[in-house]
């Protein structure tokens, strides 16, 4: 679970305007942070299969948001993947 302070930092870094909290860029950044936290969790709790299912759902949702962003706003897509280091 993301701490509210960390979530606010992510939103301020990726938002497109002052009151932006739900744009694809922000959602992708928040999901990426949650995915990173779960990945660290699995280094010590390898047999936590219910959380692994949640991780796969988060990865799938992030993938769909990235596909949407790539289709509708290629410049933002490149910017987001560059900042997060998700893909080539």
Curated annotation (Swiss-Prot):
Domain of life: Bacteria
GO biological process: translation
Entry GO MF terms: rRNA binding; structural constituent of ribosome
Alphabetical list of InterPro entries matching this protein: Ribosomal_uS15, Ribosomal_uS15_bac-type, uS15_NS1_RNA-bd_sf
Keywords recorded for this protein, A-Z: Ribonucleoprotein, Ribosomal protein, RNA-binding, rRNA-binding
One GO cellular component term noted in the UniProt record for this chain: cytosolic small ribosomal subunit
Keyword presence, Ribosomal protein: yes
Record's function text: One of the primary rRNA binding proteins, it binds directly to 16S rRNA where it helps nucleate assembly of the platform of the 30S subunit by binding and bridging several RNA helices of the 16S rRNA. Forms an intersubunit bridge (bridge B4) with the 23S rRNA of the 50S subunit in the ribosome.
Summary of subunit composition and partner proteins: Part of the 30S ribosomal subunit. Forms a bridge to the 50S subunit in the 70S ribosome, contacting the 23S rRNA.
Protein family according to the UniProt entry: Belongs to the universal ribosomal protein uS15 family.
Protein name (database record): Small ribosomal subunit protein uS15
The organism of origin for this protein: Acidobacterium capsulatum (strain ATCC 51196 / DSM 11244 / BCRC 80197 / JCM 7670 / NBRC 15755 / NCIMB 13165 / 161)
């Amino acid at each position: 679970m993301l701490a509210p302070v960390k979530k606010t930092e992510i939103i301020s870094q990726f938002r497109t305007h002052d009151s932006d909290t739900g744009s694809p860029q922000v959602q992708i950044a928040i999901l990426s942070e949650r995915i990173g936290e779960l990945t660290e969790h699995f280094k010590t709790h390898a047999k936590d299969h219910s959380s692994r299912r949640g991780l796969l759902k988060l990865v799938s949702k992030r993938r769909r948001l990235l596909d949407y962003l790539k289709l509708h706003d290629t410049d933002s897509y490149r910017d987001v993947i560059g900042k997060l280091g998700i893909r080539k």
